[in-house]
Amino acid sequence: MSFGRSNHVHRGILMETEIRFKIRHRETFADGESFGNTGQYERIAGEIRFAVDPDSDAYSMVVDLKHAPRNDHGFVEFATDFYILKPADLAQGNRRLLYDVNNRGALRMLQFFNDAVHSNTPSTTEHAGNGFLMRRGYSLVWSGWQGDIMPGDGRQTMRLPIATENGEEITGVTRSEFIVDEHGVLSMPLSANGYTSSYEAISTDTRDATFTMREYESDQRQPIADDDWAFARLQNGRPIPSAFHCHLPRGFKPGWIYELVYTAKNPNVQGLGLTGVRDLISFLLHDEADTEGTPNPLRLNGTRMEKAYGWGRSQSGRFLREFVYRGYNEDSQGRRVFDAISPHVSGGGRVVLNYRFAQPGRYPRPHD
């Protein structure tokens, strides 16, 4: 993708940030159903392309951003999916933006507020549920923030740059845990699940890694011999060498903790998930149009969003805590981003996001 620097004077976000909306779907929501005094809703989906100045103070906290590739204007590029449900007539809405921090790429807000059937691409009356948020007039927004989520099932994803140092690959020690729930599992992605990408091992030689197992967290780790496992995946029942998978021919014991420590390469700049949310919400609150003049979808004929609220369940609530605690609830002009946040059933933790080789989908459990 290519970006040009913009001099639009109407943009609220300064020259350190460029935003381009690529709208791919725009249509009436829920078969044109009318929701009380708010009326009909509109569905908008597509991609947002960002270009940010890595030398700006607004991005100084993003780990490895200075090691990311730059375009011809010195900006770092990345992109995210987005999804918006808004009143067809914004003037009939309540001028409130409600942002749902997706949970591992999944959209959860309508399930919990509207008693709706879950969908990552809500479009029907069934997906509107009881219509509660629509009758109240909210504009609903989703976007990607977790850079290791893989495409599929309508999940919200990001496309992040890979950091390098002086043109060379960055490597580092990383750790992965595997816990399976059933017998017969012989191979696992290094990320421990099928919807999260794995950091590539620099070598498939098992002597360069450490693989252990234990039944309980407090137990002593039992080494697994180098010859008893492989960096491999199964294809038609046969192991194929893979720097992204772990293969244990005797099978993983259900409930046991398997820990793999290995040297990985090519970390992506995960911290841009935090700035991407910040800059998107700031844009939707304050700007008339993006860098190329595409109108702000939540601003029309003098009607604009006056407040923004963030909601997240479990992992998503932990993201909101991290977002606030790290100082991202202030945009590049010192304005508040979210007026309120609601971390729902998220425990007391935060996400591990703005680190080299971050794995934001990981979370502590009593067993591991």
Across the structure, where does each feature detected by a protein language model lie?
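Short, Lys/Arg-enriched N-terminal segments with co-localized hydrophobic residues
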Residues: 3-14
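A signal for specific C-terminal beta-sheet/loop modules enriched in small/flexible residues
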Residues: 1-2, 48
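C-terminal His-loop and adjacent cap/lid subdomain of alpha/beta-hydrolase
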Residues: 16-368
